[in-house]
């Protein structure tokens, strides 16, 4: 952007303090309508952009999602030049009517569209409209610029300062809910809905490792954008109505538009215009089960790639958002839990850049998040540990390639509880690449932990676990321990037929059993190296069972897949 256009964006080319307010506002509205007419007349043509295949019909509108990486066409110079002139007109109108909400809203909307974020923030610094509206516009500008933490704080201030009935409308998430959650939400009063929404936003947050909840700031940015567009002529050529508002709140606003080529040179008609939201986009909302019991949530309680999603969001930092293969285990320390998580992106074709930023977050609620961060080269396994109180929490392991804009995430619940001093307990199993000499110590095992449970025919597999309360007082009776590796499933019909004919042997399993006297003390670390070289590729269950002299038998399990 040149210097002259920037001056136009901020200050305008002319000032007329003698113009009456109504005339100024009418002129500004005519300028906005004229710009949208110019935009419609100069949109790039895209055959087949209006397919008629709708995922959702919302009033007058047809919405569909094609997926894939978006390729935004270059904006025609005529549209860009016309926007600069509109912004100059709006800047002049703002000089005459500095407190007008419609004018300042249009300035922010078109500055954000122009990607002039610094100019938008400059405008907000001198905003003289209603306080909460200025704050909401500032939240929109900060969110669009990628300052999610700043946007979160600014929107929080706007919600605090707006009238109660307005706040109830802005915090309403009914358009984003479906099924049983939608029915439950509908029965709540405003205060109950705010409590419900706080929990929902916590579980909907895409990455706990980023400052601010960008899915929530996206929602309030959409609410702000929808209010800006009220009583305006839109790019579609339609006047604003509830269907356009619902579309924006659920799927966001279009970042570019295209039109269908004319069907005939003889008949002139209004062009068929398609708005294009950013892609790929995802649904980050939790299932009802995860909402009610976060500590028991499963990975598939977040269906990011749902084809017919109730809502969508395309984070600017994620051209891809994929599951993260990993291994995680929980170990006790008094009333705290140590969570170890390891991942390995060496063979992930999405992560071709050398560097990755990783994080392990344990979220008991929105305000209680323990997090460890890590960054470095993608080659080899990276392990992170977090210590937090033993309680149910959501585990979120996150890896991000900032330059490639790729994200991988593993998220699910972990239902830990305080240890019982009178009961023998066992930790999770942690698989590792064993050295020649194995030391029974968690800190020694973590650097060698596998970043996956898919193992390429390992000859030797290290298995680490801890026992708690296994030897109480002066008890000197040994405990019986066993480790088994068992093939899951019986194989396909072809293998069963070959086995019945004696062409192949039965699946091999591994079983080790021994007795030992646990050492005194609250924690008894143990590790064992198992030879798996005779096992065929497939899915297996590793189980460690301990039968103490007093008390019930305890077990820990880990599923693995052996590949060639």
Regions found by a protein language model. Name each.
Residues 128-130, 143-165:
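TPR/TPR-like (Sel1-like) alpha-helical repeat modules
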Residues 63-68, 86, 96-104, 129-136, ...:
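Generic helix N-cap/helix-start motif at coil->alpha-helix transitions
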Residues 83, 116-118, 148:
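TPR-repeat structural position
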Residues 14-79, 284-564:
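Intrinsically disordered, low-complexity terminal regions enriched in Ser/Thr/Pro/Gly
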Residues 187-317:
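A cross-family detector of function-defining hotspots
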């Amino acid at each position: 952007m040149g210097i002259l256009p920037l001056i136009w964006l901020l200050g305008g080319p002319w000032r007329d303090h003698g113009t009456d307010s109504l005339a100024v506002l009418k002129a500004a509205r005519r300028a906005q309508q004229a710009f949208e007419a110019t935009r419609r007349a100069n949109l790039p043509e895209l055959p087949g952009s209006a397919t008629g295949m709708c995922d959702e019909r919302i009033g007058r509108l047809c919405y569909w999602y094609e997926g894939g990486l978006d390729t935004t066409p270059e904006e025609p110079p005529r549209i860009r030049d016309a926007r600069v002139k509109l912004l100059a007109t709006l800047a002049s109108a703002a000089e005459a009517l500095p407190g007008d909400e419609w004018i300042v809203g249009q300035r922010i909307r078109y500055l954000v569209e122009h990607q002039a974020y610094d100019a938008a923030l400059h405008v907000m610094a001198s905003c003289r409209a209603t306080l909460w509206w200025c704050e909401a516009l500032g939240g929109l500008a900060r969110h669009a610029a990628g300052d999610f933490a700043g946007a979160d704080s600014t929107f929080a201030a706007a919600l605090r300062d707006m009238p109660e009935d307005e706040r109830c409308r802005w915090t309403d998430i009914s358009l984003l809910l479906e099924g049983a959650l939608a029915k439950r939400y509908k029965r709540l009063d405003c205060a109950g809905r705010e409590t419900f929404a706080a929990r929902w936003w916590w579980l909907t947050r895409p990455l706990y490792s980023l400052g601010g909840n960008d899915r929530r700031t996206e929602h309030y940015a959409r609410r702000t954008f929808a209010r800006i567009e009220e009583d305006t002529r839109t790019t579609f050529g339609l006047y604003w109505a509830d269907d356009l508002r619902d579309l924006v709140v659920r799927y966001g606003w279009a970042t570019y538009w295209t039109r269908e080529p004319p069907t005939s040179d003889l008949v002139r008609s209004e062009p068929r215009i398609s708005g294009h939201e950013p892609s790929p986009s995802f649904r980050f909302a939790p299932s009802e089960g995860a909402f009610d019991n976060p500590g028991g949530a499963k990975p598939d309680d977040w269906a990011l790639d749902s084809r017919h999603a109730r809502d969508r969001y395309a984070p600017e930092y994620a051209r891809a958002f994929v599951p993260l293969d990993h291994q995680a285990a929980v170990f006790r320390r008094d009333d705290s839990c140590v969570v170890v998580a390891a991942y390995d992106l060496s063979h992930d074709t999405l992560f071709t850049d050398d560097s990755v930023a990783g994080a392990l977050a344990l979220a008991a609620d929105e305000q209680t998040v323990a997090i460890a961060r890590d960054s470095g080269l993608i080659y080899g396994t990276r392990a992170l540990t977090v210590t937090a109180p033993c309680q149910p929490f959501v585990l979120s392991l996150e890896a991000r390639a900032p330059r490639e804009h790729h994200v991988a995430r593993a998220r699910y619940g972990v239902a830990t509880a305080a240890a019982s001093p009178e009961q023998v307990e066992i930790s999770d199993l942690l698989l590792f690449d064993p050295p020649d000499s194995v030391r029974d110590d968690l800190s020694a095992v973590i650097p060698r932990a596998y970043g996956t449970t898919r193992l390429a025919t390992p000859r030797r597999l290290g298995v680490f676990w801890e026992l708690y309360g296994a030897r109480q007082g002066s008890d000197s009776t040994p405990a019986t321990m066993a480790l088994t590796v068992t093939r899951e499933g019986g194989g396909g019909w072809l293998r069963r037929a070959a086995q019945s004919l004696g062409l192949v042997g039965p699946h091999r399993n591994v079983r080790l059993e021994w007795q030992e006297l646990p050492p005194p003390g609250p924690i008894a670390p143990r590790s064992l190296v198992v030879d798996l070289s005779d096992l065929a590729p497939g899915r297996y269950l590793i189980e460690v069972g301990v039968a103490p002299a007093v008390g019930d038998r305890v077990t820990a399990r880990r599923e693995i897949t052996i590949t060639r």
